[in-house]
Design a protein with these regions (language model features):
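An acidic/histidine-cluster motif and surrounding catalytic segment
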Residues: 1-111, 119-151
């Protein structure tokens, strides 16, 4: 079992049950980087804070649902790339998650956003068509595995 550390900071009034996110981190990191240490920071914030982060890091003056940072991207890769440690930060705007949840519960939408953000943190992307298909496939796979118990 890989050592996975998930640190969650919630700056909002939203009452967060961290166990589903812990389970998701264990499954995704354990599957994508078996045996690699994973350190994941999650910040749950509001629109105002996200707008600042989005402006600071991406140059966009608006809120967004999630920002992900692969902090290990600059680390030297180990001989077995899958064993390279994972360091990522994920910022989630709970107000935006609420607005876009549609028929999902807030917890379900939060899980979907967390899965998306964590896959980015692991180096997956959806800019190029081939990458987009791979990331979408992985998102669907993990949603199917993890969403059964999320109400």
């Amino acid at each position: 079992v890989s050592p996975i550390q998930l640190n969650i900071e919630n700056e909002t009034d939203f009452e967060l049950d961290s166990e589903p996110l812990q389970e998701a981190a264990r499954l995704i990191c354990g599957s994508e980087r078996p045996g690699a240490p994973c350190q994941i920071g999650v910040l749950i914030c509001n629109d105002e804070a996200m707008r600042e982060y989005n402006r600071l890091y991406r140059g966009h003056d608006s809120a967004t649902d999630v920002l992900s940072f692969d902090l290990g991207a600059e680390l030297p890769k180990s001989d077995a790339e899958l064993a390279t440690p994972v360091f990522c930060d994920i910022i989630i705007d709970i107000n935006q998650v609420e607005r876009q949840k549609g028929s999902n519960s807030l917890e379900q939408e939060l899980m979907e956003i967390f899965i998306h953000g964590l896959l980015h943190g692991l180096g997956f992307d959806h800019i190029r068509t081939g990458d987009q298909k791979l990331m979408k496939t992985k998102e669907e796979y993990y949603k199917n595995k993890l969403m059964r118990g999320v109400q």
